[in-house]
Design a protein with these regions (language model features):
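SF2 DExD/H RNA helicase N-terminal ATP-binding lobe
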Residues: 1-86
Length: 86
C-alpha cells in the first residue's frame, strides 16, 4: 500500500477488541505478506502514525484514534477497498 493509504479497514469500538482482532489477523497477514497496523487510543500516536507511513495495508482501529490520525494527515481512506464495522 502507499504510505498513509491502507487498503482495508477494520473499525472496532474498543482497544480490547482491536487487540483481539489484531491477534486473529496476524497469522493470516504474515502468510500473505500484508502489513497490519493497530491504531487505538491510550497508546503513543507517533508509533501508530509511523506504521501508517510505512504502508500498512490493513488497519484495525478504534473510531477516536482513527479520526485523530486522519485529522493529522497521517491516514487517508480514499484507497480503502474493504471495510469491516464491528
Amino acid at each position: 500500500a502507499e504510505p498513509r493509504q491502507p487498503l482495508a479497514l477494520v473499525l472496532v469500538p474498543t482497544r480490547e477488541l482491536a487487540q483481539q482482532v489484531t491477534d486473529a489477523l496476524t497469522p493470516y497477514a504474515r502468510s500473505v505478506r500484508l502489513r497490519l497496523a493497530t491504531v487505538v487510543g491510550g497508546m503513543p500516536i507517533g508509533r501508530q502514525a509511523s506504521a501508517l507511513r510505512g504502508g500498512a495495508e490493513v488497519v484495525v482501529a478504534t473510531p477516536g484514534r482513527l479520526k485523530d490520525l486522519i485529522d493529522r494527515g497521517d491516514c487517508r481512506l480514499n484507497q480503502v477497498a474493504i471495510t469491516v464495522l464491528d
